[in-house]
Amino acid sequence: MLSLDLQSRQPIYEQLVRGLSELVSLGALAPDEQLPSVRSLARDLGVNPNTVQKAYQELERSGVIYSVAGKGSFVSPGPAAARMLRGQ
């Protein structure tokens, strides 16, 4: 799903933001599809849950994902991921 370069100068949360945005824009993650929980994604990637939470917060702020209390995070419908990748 996602690969991280732990030796990169780019922060891990930024790598997560970019990777998830790419998956959304390529259609690998469909609109309204539920994302993995913060804890499960952190465990799978071997990173701190706070790192994943920061990435999810950035994606939500940018409109790529949305959160539902008690349910999780989901892919937003619309072109937000493509705009984010283009730097707009």
Residue ranges and their predicted role:
Residues M1-L2, Y13-E14, L29, L45, ...:
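Broad hydrophobic/π-residue packing in well-ordered secondary structure
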Residues M1-Q34, S40, M84, Q88:
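Extreme N-terminal segment that seeds HTH/winged-HTH DNA-binding domains in transcriptional regulators
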Residues L16, R43-L45, P49-N50, Y56, ...:
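Alpha-helix boundary/interfacial micro-motifs
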Residues L35-Y66:
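N-terminal helix-turn-helix
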Residues S62-Q88:
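HTH-adjacent hinge/linker in prokaryotic transcriptional regulators
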